[in-house]
Amino acid sequence: MSTLRLRGDLPERVDLLNITPLALSGLSEAEAGKLAIGTSRRGLTLGDVFEISLDGSDSLVIEGGSARLDRVGAALSQGSIRVEGDVGQRLGEGMAAGSLTVTGSAGPYAGTGATGGTITIEGDAGDHAGGAVYAAKAGLDGATLVIKGAAGDHLGDRMRRGMILAGSAGAFAASRMIAGTIVVSGALGDHPGYGMRRGTLIAGSHGTLLPTFVETGTPDLVFVRLLAQSLKHLGAAQASLLSGTLRRYSGDLATLGKGELFVPA
């Protein structure tokens, strides 16, 4: 297991794009220490910020967190990364495979553009978790994003495929959603599914619902029971939510209107 131990408070935001087990596996500790990660004129390197210990394995642990650690696990294609603490924005951006775990909380845009693998945030996530960054065509695009705490506004904005689990979420969850599944065990904020084209949003409760969502009854759908079984190892609270009778709403009828929102009946 390779480790990066944070030396202290960060003087600026740092960009950890491509700081992955695969990228570090062919480098010596001295070579890794020269990798540029700064975002200002200071020219910070990996060695300036972290004490580095490499063993060539496919497992990397970052000891110590900071809200200034941006793009942790971005472009991860194999192996695992574990962060003991908080991280900044764009956690796991463009991740293709592997496992990425944060023991603290994450900033905005966690999981944006991630096509595979599993991202687990044991704390809270900022706005636009699983959402699209500016000018991007899609947010989460096939990966699994698990948020054990609360997610901010616009959870899953322009999500294209994959799955998001969360404890609760703010306003505009599943906004502009293209496809995929979001299960929130607790409450949603106002206007869930704004501009939703397709996809499935399941929640314990919701705030103000858009007038462009219409109730379609309480169907007994096989896929909901199958989804509950598949979620048991990822989120017990989310799986439990699916075991009861759910009321279905269809929308957003102001767009394509093939999305669906389920809440307990």
UniProtKB/Swiss-Prot annotation:
Subcellular location: Cytoplasm
The protein's annotated pathway: One-carbon metabolism; formaldehyde degradation; formate from formaldehyde (H(4)MPT route): step 4/5
MF term (GO), any: formylmethanofuran dehydrogenase activity
Any one GO biological process: formaldehyde catabolic process
InterPro entries listed in its UniProt record: Formylmethanofuran_DH_suC, Glu_synth_asu_C, Glu_synth_asu_C_sf
Keywords, alphabetical: Cytoplasm, One-carbon metabolism
Source taxon at top rank: Bacteria
Claim: Ubl conjugation is one of the keywords in the record: no
Gene Ontology CC annotations of this record: cytoplasm
Pfam hit, one: GXGXG
Keyword Mitochondrion belongs to the record: no
Assembly: Octaheteromer. Part of the formyltransferase/hydrolase complex fhc; composed of FhcA, FhcB, FhcC and FhcD.
Family: Belongs to the FwdC/FmdC family.
Other comments on record: Although FhcB and FhcC do not possess a formylMFR dehydrogenase (Fmd) activity and have an unknown function, they are required for the stability of the complex.
Function: Involved in the transformation of 5-formyl tetrahydromethanopterin (5-formyl-H(4)MPT) to methanofuran (MFR) and formate via the formylmethanofuran (formyl-MFR).
The name this protein goes by in its record: Formyltransferase/hydrolase complex Fhc subunit C
